[in-house]
């Protein structure tokens, strides 16, 4: 499977910002028996990477192409460990706090602009591909405070102090980070599994019982190299993030992904940009958000600007896809700002620049991705991401790139051999923690094993029985 084709549309744009973002980091002792090699400099990496990509100009989807990157071009981190939408879980668990429909939609936006904080705080890199049946799980005991000055480096511990955002019927809040004062501790659990190899798809599930909120979805990418940049968009099975508020009559929000671009190859400074539209819809409340990302400004200067609108819509006749096409009478709020800086909103239908009172949705400047708790390595299964890739990770960290490439190639060959065995036996691989590889459409369901794994994370019981069969070894 192509190393450029991980399981999520954003995984190929992963950044080094969270290079030590797990309490059980994939950094163990340096392998013995192989000498350390001189690491390539960034310029050399770019030239090698660009040379590989140029072979695929015109290929419609790099995710469908088989090629292998040398280990020295990889970030020593598994995709499933790195990629998730909980860079700031504090914003996630506060989505359902408001008693007003508009307040909850604004809560979704606050989560949206922080879920991929790694792209704002770090530089692009390439983690490992996920193998079929590989999985990763996180247990986070958290008390949430968005602007905590001293973020712990071994877990997600912040106070549940997010206020609801101001709406026409709510009392004003002095700032988006003001404190509610209950200091409640909650637990957020997360599990993801590589459910398909062709095409590469992973399923994920997030659960916070104390707050009555969960999220699920499939991650899959489609990638194309244009000659100067890589355009990465959601694959056919990736319909976005589906968030359910159980305490709000199972109110569901669908958040779709915009296309992202990895550029800067010619300048030797890789960067992530977004120039596309995305949508947040809630059929129960009849509210929809359109966000339009505008990458380039005057004379090509990047502004990373985003504009948007929250409006009343007909879920049975949803055909409005552009901000300019939204009837003014249906507009509840307008959004504008820089997704790498501050994003604001105004209430009502008037143009954003004609409303004097602007409210802060989020300021990402003081924020960093929050570390996560994972099971101890000795309690992980052989196909659990950190343990599965341990040898490759250790070799890369020890600058033993020849050894790392050899170990990585061995993993790839074993996976192909297992796939050939299943094909010869006419046997279909079935995920362990999710009911289907790509079904139900858009919204994966947990198996009894998946539900049990989540329950174990809630109470810090990590031991799981071994698989009856492994897909990649």
Which ranges hold each PLM region?
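Extended acidic, Ser/Thr- and Pro-enriched interaction/regulatory segments
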Residues: 2-94, 102-473
């Amino acid at each position: 499977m192509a190393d450029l084709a991980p399981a999520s549309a954003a995984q190929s744009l992963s950044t080094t910002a969270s290079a030590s973002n797990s309490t059980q980091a994939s950094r163990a002792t340096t392998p013995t028996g192989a000498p350390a090699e001189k690491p390539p400099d960034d310029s050399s990496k770019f030239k090698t990477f660009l040379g590989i990509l140029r072979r695929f100009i015109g290929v419609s989807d790099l995710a469908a192409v088989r090629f292998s990157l040398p280990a020295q071009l990889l970030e020593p981190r598994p995709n499933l460990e790195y990629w998730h939408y909980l860079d700031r879980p504090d914003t996630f668990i506060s989505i359902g706090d408001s008693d007003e429909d508009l307040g909850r939609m604004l809560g979704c936006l606050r989560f949206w602009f922080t879920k991929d904080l790694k792209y704002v705080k770090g530089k692009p890199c390439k983690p490992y591909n996920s193998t079929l049946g590989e999985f990763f799980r996180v247990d986070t005991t958290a008390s949430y405070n968005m602007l905590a000055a001293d973020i712990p480096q071994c877990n997600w511990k912040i106070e549940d102090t997010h206020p609801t955002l101001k709406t026409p019927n709510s009392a004003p809040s002095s700032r988006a980070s003001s404190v509610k004062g209950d200091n409640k501790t909650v637990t957020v659990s997360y599990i993801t599994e590589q459910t398909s190899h062709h095409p590469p798809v992973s399923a994920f599930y997030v659960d916070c019982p104390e707050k009555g909120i969960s999220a699920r979805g499939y991650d899959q990418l489609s990638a194309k190299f244009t000659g100067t940049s890589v355009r990465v968009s959601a694959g056919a099975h990736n319909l976005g993030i589906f968030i359910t508020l159980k305490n709000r009559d199972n109110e569901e929000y669908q958040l779709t992904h915009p296309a992202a671009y990895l550029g800067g190859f010619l300048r030797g400074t890789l960067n992530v940009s977004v120039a596309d539209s995305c949508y947040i819809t809630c059929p129960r409340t009849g509210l929809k958000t359109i966000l339009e990302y505008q990458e380039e400004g005057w004379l090509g200067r990047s502004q990373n600007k985003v504009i948007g609108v929250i409006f009343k819509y007909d879920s049975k006749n949803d055909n409005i896809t552009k901000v300019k096409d939204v009837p003014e009478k249906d507009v509840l709020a307008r959004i504008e700002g820089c997704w790498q800086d501050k994003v604001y909103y105004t209430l009502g239908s008037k143009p954003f620049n004609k409303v004097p009172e602007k409210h802060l949705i989020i300021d990402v400047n003081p924020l960093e991705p929050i570390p996560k708790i994972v099971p101890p390595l000795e309690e992980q299964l052989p196909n659990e991401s950190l343990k599965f890739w341990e040898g490759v990770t250790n070799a890369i960290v020890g600058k033993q790139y020849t050894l790392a490439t050899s170990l990585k190639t061995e993993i790839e060959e074993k996976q192909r051999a297992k796939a050939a065995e299943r094909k010869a036996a006419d046997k279909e691989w079935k995920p362990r923690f999710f009911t289907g590889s790509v079904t139900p459409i858009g919204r994966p369901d947990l198996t009894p094993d998946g539900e049990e794994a989540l329950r174990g994370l809630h109470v810090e019981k990590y031991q799981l029985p071994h698989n009856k069969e492994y897909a990649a070894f």
